[in-house]
């Protein structure tokens, strides 16, 4: 079992501090914020192992966290401003567990996790938790051949000031060593059933955008 603590400072970049507006697209401008302050970040972590079971827990507290999102551009309703702001306080918690075992040629690892941020911004709460689960399978075949099949799931959740959509994905890979391990042949398929999407629903004040 191990317990860790980390303190760090995240400073805004010159581009984020620059008091100017730059063109991104017909509907998005990037706007600097010279009033940004450095963020102070405290992290606490715990890792414990019980045989083949591994458990992890993390907590984070931050003052003046730097967060980039979309906001209405003053006097132009049809244009969004991509801007970095300071959140006065930011807190998050996460817990996870992983268990791996071997059954003949099959070597699966099952993982599950929970994470939640706690953000209040302009009267709204952005604290919908994220649940993740995965089953990572490896099958060892003769003649240095390996088959991998990973099944991944994540729930609808808040990510900063955004809503991340529910996701499900299956990835497969076949790997074979050739010429006495001098060469390696890999055949892989990502998102086998075409179910994955990285779309986010961005909601800041009165702005809703894909």
Label every PLM stretch briefly.
Residues 1, 5, 44-50, 95-101, ...:
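Residues on the lipid-exposed face of transmembrane beta-strands in outer-membrane beta-barrel proteins
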Residues 2-4, 54-56, 107-109, 146, ...:
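Membrane-spanning beta-strand positions in outer-membrane beta-barrel proteins
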Residues 5-11, 21, 50-52, 59-65, ...:
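Transmembrane beta-strands of outer-membrane beta-barrel pores
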Residues 13-22, 26-30, 61, 65-74, ...:
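Outer-membrane beta-barrel translocator domains and adjoining extracellular loop/strand segments
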Residues 61-63, 79-82, 86-152:
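Gram-negative outer-membrane beta-barrel transporters
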Residues 178-210:
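C-terminal beta-signal and adjacent terminal beta-strands/loops
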